[in-house]
Curated annotation (Swiss-Prot):
Source organism (scientific name): Aspergillus niger
Stored InterPro entries: Chitin_synth, Chitin_synth_fun
EC number: 2.4.1.16
One Pfam assignment: Chitin_synth_1
This protein's UniProt keywords: Cell membrane, Cell wall biogenesis/degradation, Glycosyltransferase, Membrane, Transferase, Transmembrane
GO cellular component, one term: plasma membrane
Mode of membrane association: Multi-pass membrane protein
Its job: Polymerizes chitin, a structural polymer of the cell wall and septum, by transferring the sugar moiety of UDP-GlcNAc to the non-reducing end of the growing chitin polymer.
Gene Ontology BP, a term: chitin biosynthetic process
Similarity-based family: Belongs to the chitin synthase family. Class I subfamily.
Lineage start: Eukaryota, Fungi, Dikarya, Ascomycota, Pezizomycotina
Catalyzed reactions per annotation: [(1->4)-N-acetyl-beta-D-glucosaminyl](n) + UDP-N-acetyl-alpha-D-glucosamine = [(1->4)-N-acetyl-beta-D-glucosaminyl](n+1) + UDP + H(+)
Gene Ontology terms for molecular function: chitin synthase activity
PANTHER family for this protein: CHITIN SYNTHASE (PTHR22914), CHITIN SYNTHASE 1 (PTHR22914:SF9)
Protein's recorded name: Chitin synthase 1
Length: 189
């Protein structure tokens, strides 16, 4: 739940940043309407119950609705959709909900019935949601990755400036909290 919340907080801050770009032709106060956050979880039995609780708090998951079969046919995935105005906060390793002061966030949560690994989740995103949403760009983040407040904007900007750009990546930095020193020089460098 902590890693998931850290990622979502970074995504929320990026959406707020895009909404704050009032002189932009693309973004501005209604930028949130152009952004959909898709969360894909790999396996109903595998999802962390605390992460499930965070998703429920955001409004994009309801416990007790998912079934393994419907009318005798196996279910592949469960899809929840919600525009949330709930924010997240990290305090001492705990995740708490708070009212969002920024713009709303459109969310889709896909809970796959079976654990079929990361590449299958990527395929789900591109083949299922990509076809329906028809996005101009997609940014994939693993749980635990915290994007800087404007990182996603800068990734988008690379595509906007060069329409022939087929891919872009951001920089990943090691996070050391509260002045702790890394003892492994291979990781610290």
């Amino acid at each position: 739940d902590f890693l998931f919340a850290r990622t979502m907080i970074g995504v929320f801050k990026n959406i707020e940043y895009m909404c704050s770009r009032t002189s932009s032709k693309t973004w501005g106060k209604d930028a949130w309407k152009k952004i959909v956050v898709c969360v894909i979880s790999d396996g109903r039995a595998k999802i962390n119950p605390r992460t499930r609780a965070v998703l429920a708090g955001l409004g994009c998951y309801q416990d007790g609705i998912a079934k393994q079969q419907v009318n005798g046919k196996d279910v592949t995935a469960h899809i929840y959709e919600y525009t949330t105005q709930v924010g997240l906060e990290l305090k001492g390793g705990q995740v708490s909900l708070k009212p969002r002061t920024g713009c709303p966030v459109q969310m889709i949560f896909c809970l796959k019935e079976k654990n079929q690994k990361k590449i299958n989740s990527h395929r789900w995103f591109f083949q299922a949601f990509g076809r329906v949403l028809d996005p101009n760009i997609c940014v994939l983040l693993d749980a635990g990755t915290r994007x800087g407040k404007d990182s996603i904007y800068h990734l988008w900007k690379x595509f906007d400036v060069d329409p022939m750009c087929g891919g872009a990546c951001g920089e990943i930095k090691v996070m050391x909290s509260h002045g702790k020193k890394l003892l492994n020089p291979l990781v610290a460098g």
